[in-house]
Amino acid sequence: MEKNRTTTFSVYLTIILFLISTFITMVITESNIIRVPEFQCPNGYRKDANGKCREVFHG
């Protein structure tokens, strides 16, 4: 009976360590961010909060 409990505990411990290592690997490799080059707005336009070029009105 005692050997069965030890085996079950070892299996659970192995699974937990595998899940933790998988999670750590996912967190470390998730930081690959692709940066898109930004373009400039034409004269008389400015970028709004969404990044779209909007015409500037002088009043």
UniProtKB/Swiss-Prot annotation:
UniProt subcellular location: Secreted
Modified residues (Histidine amide): 58
Any GO CC annotation of this UniProt entry: extracellular region
Prosegment location in residue numbers: 28-31
Alphabetic keyword roster: Amidation, Secreted, Signal
Tissue expression: Expressed by the venom gland.
Identification of the protein by name: U17-myrmicitoxin-Tb1f
